[in-house]
Regions:
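Gram-negative outer-membrane beta-barrel transporters
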Residues: 31-168
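Short glycine/serine- and small hydrophobic-enriched flexible loop segments
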Residues: 18-19, 94
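Solvent-exposed loop/turn elements at secondary-structure boundaries
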Residues: 1-7, 12, 17, 23-34, ...
Length: 169
């Protein structure tokens, strides 16, 4: 797409690490990312729901075997709008000696505070896909969590892990 412009972004974060004792660590990071001129392909549903807005993405394709021309859609990358995501990353780690080894337990994740984007083709109509299937054909999960427990000795290491993403509508 010759009209494609580069994405630009503004981002910030602030965080802290708290270690009240040698075996316990807690960290928190609040972050925000804003993207302008996001590059993505417009979904087929959006193209067909707004044919006048995306008329330049319609074309015809000749099928040689049938000799017919059919309607086709070009799924080209375009600058579609703005995106803003904000969340909190956290990590809790506990370490302890256990028998002949060391047990490390971690709980880490992201809690998404905001995930929104402008309706394609606009600069001021915001939508969200936070915990739901959005018009951008994506889901932004509010909670993404991973827990691990690792037992390590001089001879072996065993890790048990679990991952979680909350449901969506």
């Amino acid at each position: 797409n010759p009209e494609l412009k580069p994405e630009t972004s503004k981002q910030w974060s602030i965080g802290t690490v708290f270690e009240p004792i040698d075996s316990l660590s807690m960290s928190f990071d609040l972050w925000n990312v804003q993207i302008n001129d996001q590059v993505t392909a417009v979904s087929e549903g959006l193209i067909f729901n707004n044919p006048s807005k995306y008329a330049d993405l319609f074309t015809t394709k000749h099928i040689t075997s049938t000799g017919l021309d059919v309607l086709a859609v070009k799924l080209l990358p375009i600058n579609i709008g703005k995106v803003e995501n904000r969340g909190i990353d956290y990590d809790f780690t506990h370490k302890m000696k256990l028998l002949d080894g060391r047990l490390t337990t971690r709980l880490m994740g992201t809690y998404l505070l905001r995930s929104r984007y402008t309706t394609p083709g606009t600069n001021d109509q915001w939508e969200t896909s936070l915990n739901r299937y959005g018009s951008n054909d994506k889901v932004s999960f509010r909670n993404i969590i991973r827990a691990t427990s690792t037992y390590e000795t001089a001879k072996f290491t065993h890790t048990l892990s679990a991952s979680y993403r909350n449901g969506y509508t």
